Amino acid sequence: MAAVAAEAAATAASPGEGGAGEAEPELEPIPGSEAGTPLPVTATEAAVPDGEADGRQSAPQADEQPLPPPPPPPPPGELADSSEAEEAKPPEPAAVPVSPPEQPPAAPEQPEDAPRPPPAPALVPPAGGDSAVSHLIPGSEVRVTLDHIIEDALVVSFRLGEKLFSGVLMDLSKRFGPHGIPVTVFPKREYKDKPDAMQLQSTTFQEGIEVKQEVNGAVPDDLSPVPPPERLWASKPPPLFHEGAPYPPPLFIRDTYNQSIPQPPPRKIKRPKRKMYREEPTSIMNAIKLRPRQVLCDKCKNSVVAEKKEIRKGSSDSSRYEDKKRRNDSVATVNKKLKTDHKVDGKNQNESQRRNTVVRVSSIAHSRGRVVKVSAQANTSKAQLNTKKVLQSKNMDHAKAREVLKIAKEKAQKKQSETSTSKTAHAKVHFTRRYQSPSSGSLPPRVRLKPQRYRNEENDSSLKTGLEKIRSGKLAPKPQSRCTSTRSAGEAPSEKPSPSEGPEESAGEVQDTSRVRVPGEQEELRMLGKKGSKSSISVYLTLNQETSDSSSASVCSIDSMDDLKSSNSECSSSESFVFPPGCMHAPSASSTSTSFSSKEENSLRNSLKMKIFSKNVSKCITPDGRTICVGDIVWAKIYGFPWWPARILTITVSRKDNGLLARQEARISWFASPTTSSLALSQLSPFLENFQLRFNKKRKGLYRRAITEAAKAAKQLTPEVRALLTQFET
């Protein structure tokens, strides 16, 4: 059995021969067995190239060759290398005659329990601790004990005196080490701190075999074995990095410090090339994409543009001079009229009233309803005043206004008996401009009232300034009344003093005020108007005490006579002014207020009367056939912002009194934002259906957060939840 194991180890030591693979099935030694016999090295080297060597062929060679004397021992540091060299030589014991002759060489894989004979004492130095180890030299043969058999490896141990050495013998015939690590040619080991005589041989197995054969006389024609090793040691070491160099095996690295081990060339590190020149500032600015920002909405932008235009106009010297002159003339006229002309002839007033174009609009189709009368003036260039003059006219003296109030009360009491035969109680509203419906076109150069959708303090002030526009020229101390009007939203009453009006001046400017007489003992005279430069606007409202109830409401829709003739539908307004009962009273009026015939008055009522009813609903159908419900998740668009997801809070449907649809609006709350907006339903689109069309992949941050919240809300809005939200009509 020992001979079979030695033969298998000898075959495994030859990596380059074709017969190396045949030794693999023979590698079945028994743990605990010993390998090593007193055979010369030349016998082993000569048997390796054949690949089919057995004990019978090597036996005669062992008999013929005498044992060489033991060489000098190597230093202790070379013990590991000597062990490797010795592990490569155990195949010689194949010729030991102890092996049974009846065992055929074709079946060496069968286990044998025959004990191995002890090695020759000439090869093993005497045991003596360090002195024994010092006797070992490279190439000497030792006996090792087989401890473990691992796949493609053997674990052996070697005892020398008191010292015990162990190691692993690998099968190099497969040219692969354990765990798939490739085993390559032994690297050349160079110890810088040792002389060349102490260096280890790093040639391939084939070269080593040929050299040993020459030394032992196996090749008769070449008897100089020393020069080849000198040539090997004198050659330059292989470069550390060259193409195709394999990685060194791991078992050789730990013993090869400060040595040149063949390695592949290092990988190239790609580094970006630095630009040596600095970029010009123009190219940097071109790389920055500038996007226009819409900071202001349409309303704010229009107001800013209007203010800029007014500033430009006011900057010119001529406009400043004209404005100053008009203010001085108006103040002088008021002072003059207050001092001298306290009583005005009714005849002159009647004449000036007849010259005006008067339109009376009835708010409710009842005989006792309130009537709004509008007196329009000729369109003259002098009568067109801007907002700047209105703001300037707010700073008039209040003391003069009190005098006007006293005169107005006296006049009203005096004229009350003259017009007691009046059939109905009328309220007159004097405006210098008309309302405009949202669908109407552009208007002549008169100031337009913007529709006030939301009731707040700003809109309240804009209404006041709108009622305080000025048209007429020089003023006279005409008795006026005071009226407290309240809007439908429940705002606080706005009271404004009105300048007195006088007869027509020679300049051709026409008075635009008239008086309305209302029968009743509890009438209180009040005035709504504004004291301004060259003209005034007065709103006179009366309340019939007998027909006053909480359900009555008046709608004020006003236009001039010439506009009525051209387009009756243009006069309709979408805004309603509701005057609660008991809060307004009208002054006395002259008999000329009934100058229109009843037929003409009825036609004007029918043409101008228009009311819009609004209702909050939970579900509505748009003109394009889509059904929108409260709680739906939609896409909404506001100028200056991208399409943004929102949730519908309320839906308001407005219709005219004839049943036609006026508008459909929705109050929405934006996702990822605390704000709400009111938009038309036509500007909304479903969220999930139009997601691919509206979603912008390039936007990040708050936009993505809003999209995420809207997607979660849309998933939760199932048809059942939608049905619950819309089952009750509000």
From Swiss-Prot:
Keywords: Isopeptide bond, Nucleus, Phosphoprotein, Transcription, Transcription regulation, Ubl conjugation. It comes from the Eukaryota. Its main location: nucleus. The modification Phosphoserine is found at residues 82, 99. Residues 1-134, 257-276, 311-355, 409-531 are annotated as: Disordered. Residues 267-276 have a biased composition (Basic residues). It is found in: Nucleus. GO terms for biological process: chromatin remodeling; positive regulation of transcription elongation by RNA polymerase II; regulation of transcriptional start site selection at RNA polymerase II promoter. There is a cross-link at residue 188 (Glycyl lysine isopeptide (Lys-Gly) (interchain with G-Cter in SUMO2)). Residues 630-690 form the PWWP domain. Residues 1-15, 488-501 have a biased composition (Low complexity). SUPFAM superfamilies: Tudor/PWWP/MBT. Residues 66-77, 91-108 have a biased composition (Pro residues). Residues 396-547 are annotated as: Interaction with the H2A.Z/H2AZ1. Component of a MTA1-specific subcomplex of the NuRD complex (M1HR), which is composed of PWWP2A, MTA1/2, HDAC1/2, and RBBP4/7 but does not contain CHD4 and MBD3. Interacts with MTA1; the interaction mediates the association of PWWP2A with the M1HR complex. Interacts with H2A.Z/H2AZ1. Interacts (via PWWP domain) with histone H3 trimethylated at 'Lys-36' (H3K36me3). Does not interact with CHD4 and MBD3. Chromatin-binding protein that acts as an adapter between distinct nucleosome components (H3K36me3 or H2A.Z) and chromatin-modifying complexes, contributing to the regulation of the levels of histone acetylation at actively transcribed genes. Competes with CHD4 and MBD3 for interaction with MTA1 to form a NuRD subcomplex, preventing the formation of full NuRD complex (containing CHD4 and MBD3), leading to recruitment of HDACs to gene promoters resulting in turn in the deacetylation of nearby H3K27 and H2A.Z. This is PWWP domain-containing protein 2A. It comes from Mus musculus. The lineage of its organism: Eukaryota, Metazoa, Chordata, Craniata, Vertebrata. The gene is Pwwp2a.
